[in-house]
Amino acid sequence: MYLVRGSLGGAARDGEMRSRVLCDVLYKYTAEGDRRKSIYKHVNNTLGKLLKGAQPKRRSGLEFYTQKLVMAVRLLFDSNAGIRKVYRGVRGELVDLEFYREKQQSREQVQWNSFTSTSMARDAALNFAGGGGVLFVITRDPEHAAAADIHEYSQFPNEQEVLLLPMQVFDVQGVHDRGGHTEIVLREVPHYPAELP
């Protein structure tokens, strides 16, 4: 069993049950552990690697979690929060730097098909990158309702997590060697994926 921080309160118009379910799903998404405690690996591996942007099967656990996470992000979205820059740290061996260099040179956009955990805190993201890792620096449009600050509902609130919806599109603005890590600078391209639940 796990404890839930925060409440979606007034944001959930159909009562406390929806609020509780969305808080639970956000907490499970940010939790560490096996699939009973944590869902982020299962959800993102399936969305990003197996489905590659396709919709989850109807009435599956994946569809349930995808719908609830999308709903939570949309309910928590606040254009007044002014979240213009977020960071994502990834171990170096997990990122194809040449892919991003090619996309920058060809001016082609990149799309991330899974939910993406980012942070408002550069240092928190650098901790995830580790030595020789990659730091994504993402400039976003604060009016684009495709990300939300979820730190209040997280198992790790100090990480200052901002969750991005799947199917986000970015322009690659730079790939830079910063000595201890590589920095990939992305600019979010505002759009609204029509197929998301």
Task: State each model region's role.
Residues 143-167:
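Flexible, small-/acidic-enriched active-site or ligand-binding loops
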Residues 138-141, 165, 187:
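A structural detector for beta-sheet-dominated domains
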Residues 79-80, 175-180:
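Short, ordered beta-strand-loop transition motifs
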Residues 133, 167-168:
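Short glycine-/polar-rich loops that comprise or flank the Walker A/P-loop
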Residues 179-197:
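Short solvent-exposed strand/turn elements
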Residues 1-152:
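Internal glycine-rich, Lys/Arg-flanked active-site/core loops of soluble domains
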